[in-house]
Curated annotation (Swiss-Prot):
Protein name per Swiss-Prot or TrEMBL: Uncharacterized PE-PGRS family protein PE_PGRS24
Keywords: Repeat
Sequence ranges assigned to domain PE in this UniProt record: 1-93
InterPro entries (UniProt xref): PE-PGRS_N (IPR000084), PGRS_rpt (IPR048996)
Organism classification: Bacteria, Bacillati, Actinomycetota, Actinomycetes, Mycobacteriales
Family, as annotated: Belongs to the mycobacterial PE family. PGRS subfamily.
Disulphide bond pairs: none
SUPFAM superfamilies given in the database record: PE/PPE dimer-like (SSF140459)
Gene3D superfamilies: HP0062-like domain
Length: 603
């Protein structure tokens, strides 16, 4: 029994390539015939004549060998071509009976149900918005939906049968006003197969771009389809939602949301699509990115991440906010990052919030700086799992002449835990070139048993005239047991940002969170340290954050220590920052009924 598999098309192409190689070698040998076999002597002496005769003899010998090789090559190509033709003829002869057999198998279901038993569905005709045909009941992919005529929605993709992928949705038609929506992706196979991608929205020439089509859902096993991109327009169209992953799928996530459409001339970029949910056990899909804003348009908001599976699964990451560009005198505004998706009911982490979009400064002299988008909120954790981290704030760029600074976006808040788990960390504030940097996000609250999330660090002020962002407050351990989250550090800048306060501990047990350190000040005072968090009934108060240093001005004040409650020591005060005059140290926290007071910070 032979296990050899041949591809006739590949063999035919190889035979053609071999023939071309032979022709090329033959032309090269013919061109070399005269120069190599008819050499002239360099002089009239006998030595020159002997040398010329020797090299001419070598050339003639080479031509003789080349002639034999050419004959062998021609015979080999002829044999190879005949073999390729034999394979092609055999395949054609074998395919005809099989096609007839397939038609016999498919005819009953085609007549009764309007779809074959085995085979792919037909694609919808372009420009009609026709739906893609359904795939075979047993095996086959759904057909792609046809694109829409001007102003007409794209056709939905065809559904698969038991095994196969759903067809992609058709593109929405362009419109003189609003663009038409893209078609939805077809459903994946009932047993196995991924959902089809949603079609992109059409262009809205004077209005809003078309909505992206939603991705198709999977059956029992498979990934959800990706949402279609929103169409461009004065306002960009929203991206389509991602499809749900298979009900029992473990590895593949829900489909990602589609990207929001581009916006022009003062509109707003489209919002990214929501990520698809997990089935019972898989992760949610990522949210789509917000649309880009051009010529004074704001960037679109990122899409929300999809929720994790019903029983277990992590939430999807929120989409990144779109970039906003300025017009001649007004800076652009970045879109907000999308919220992270929530985890499943039993196990899983909340999704990370999306990063805020960048705000670009105005291109003309005298214009304003851009404004970065706010970072997305972290998703909530499951009963057993942490909350998601907040997204980073967007960057605020200065104007083209560097006279006006941008504003950095605030970091997103961390997601909350539920039963057992820590709160998510707050996102870092966005940086700014010559303006105010964004503040850090607040840490998420812990579960019934779990620590609060750390506060996000304040953004950095990069050049003179900038203000460092304040650190975010640490999250509280809102349940029975757990430590408070540490406060975020204040950002660096000409004027420094203050550190965030530490979070409070759980009711029964836990230490208070430490306060965040103040930022470094270049021309202004150093930032003040954050206050330490309060302890639980058993636990120590959090230490105060150190005051920030200053290059030419006063050091920042240290944060006060947190108080203990019943059994525990008070937190130590933070040290004052170094500067032309040192900052004052923070006061120590008070002890519980059993414990010691915290030490004051050094000045």
């Amino acid at each position: 029994m032979s296990f050899v598999i041949a591809a006739p098309e590949t063999l035919v192409r190889a035979a053609s390539d071999l023939a071309n190689i032979g022709s090329t070698l033959g032309a090269a040998n013919a061109a070399a015939l005269g120069p190599t076999t008819e050499l002239l002597a360099a002089g009239a002496d006998e030595v020159s004549a002997a040398i010329a005769s020797l090299f001419a003899a070598h050339g003639q010998a080479y031509q003789a060998v080349s002639a034999q090789m050419s004959a062998f090559h021609a015979q080999f190509v002829q044999t190879f071509t005949a073999g390729a033709g034999a394979y092609a003829s055999a395949e054609a002869a074998a395919a005809a009976p099989l096609e007839g057999l397939l038609n016999i198998v498919n005819t009953p279901t085609q007549l009764l149900l309007g779809r074959p038993l085995i085979g792919n569905g037909a694609n919808g005709a372009p420009g009609t918005g026709q739906a893609g045909g359904a795939g075979g009941l047993l095996y086959g992919n759904g057909g792609a939906g046809g694109s829409g005529a001007p102003g007409q929605a794209g056709g939905p993709g065809g559904a698969a049968g038991l095994f196969g992928n759903g067809g992609a949705g058709g593109a929405g038609g362009d419109g003189p006003g609003n663009g038409a929506a893209g078609g939805a992706g077809g459903a994946g196979g009932l047993l196995f197969g991924s959902g089809g991608a949603g079609g992109p929205g059409g262009v809205g020439n004077t209005g809003t771009g078309g909505l992206g089509g939603d991705g198709g859902a999977a059956g029992l096993f498979g990934a959800g389809g990706i949402g279609g991109a929103g169409g461009p327009g004065f306002n960009g169209g929203a991206g389509g939602a991602g499809g749900r992953s298979g009900l029992f799928e473990v590895l593949a996530a829900g489909g990602a949301g589609g990207t929001g459409g581009l916006s022009v001339n003062g509109g707003t970029g489209g919002t990214g699509g929501t990520g698809g949910g997990g089935g019972l056990f898989s992760n949610g899909g990522a949210g789509g990115a917000g649309g880009f804003g051009v010529s004074g348009s704001a960037g679109g908001n990122g899409g929300t991440g999809g929720d994790g599976g019903i029983f277990t699964g992590n939430g999807g990451t929120g989409g990144t906010g779109g970039t906003g560009t300025g017009n001649q005198l007004v800076g652009g505004e970045g879109g907000a990052g999308g919220a992270g998706g929530n985890a499943g009911i039993l196990f899983g982490a909340g999704g990370i919030g999306g990063t805020g979009g960048t705000g670009l400064g105005a291109p003309d002299p005298g214009g304003t700086g851009g404004k970065g988008g706010v970072g997305g909120i972290g998703g909530a954790g499951a009963l057993f799992g942490p909350g998601g981290a907040g997204g980073t704030g967007g960057f605020g760029a200065s104007s083209a002449d560097q006279m006006a600074g941008g504003i950095g976006g605030s970091g997103g808040s961390g997601g909350a835990a539920k039963l057992i788990g820590d709160g998510g960390a707050g996102g870092t504030g966005g940086d700014s070139v010559r303006g105010a940097a964004g503040s850090g996000g607040t840490g998420g609250t812990g579960g019934l048993i779990g620590d609060g999330g750390a506060g996000g660090a304040g953004g950095t002020g990069i050049e003179f005239g900038s203000v460092g962002g304040a650190g975010g407050a640490g999250g509280n351990a809102a349940g029975l047991s757990g430590a408070g989250g540490a406060g975020g550090a204040g950002g660096f800048g000409e004027t420094a940002g203050d550190g965030g306060a530490g979070g409070n501990a759980g009711l029964l047990n836990g230490d208070g969170g430490a306060g965040g350190a103040g930022g470094l000040g270049i021309a202004g005072d150093g930032g003040n340290g954050g206050k330490g968090g309060k302890a639980g009934m058993v636990g120590n108060g959090g230490d105060g954050g150190a005051g920030g240093a200053s290059v030419v001005a006063n050091g920042g004040v240290g944060g006060s220590g947190g108080n203990a409650t019943l059994i525990g020591n008070g937190g130590n005060g933070g040290n004052g920052g170094v500067g032309s005059a040192p900052g004052k140290g923070g006061a120590g926290g008070t002890a519980g009924l059993l414990g010691l007071n915290g030490s004051p910070g050094l000045s």
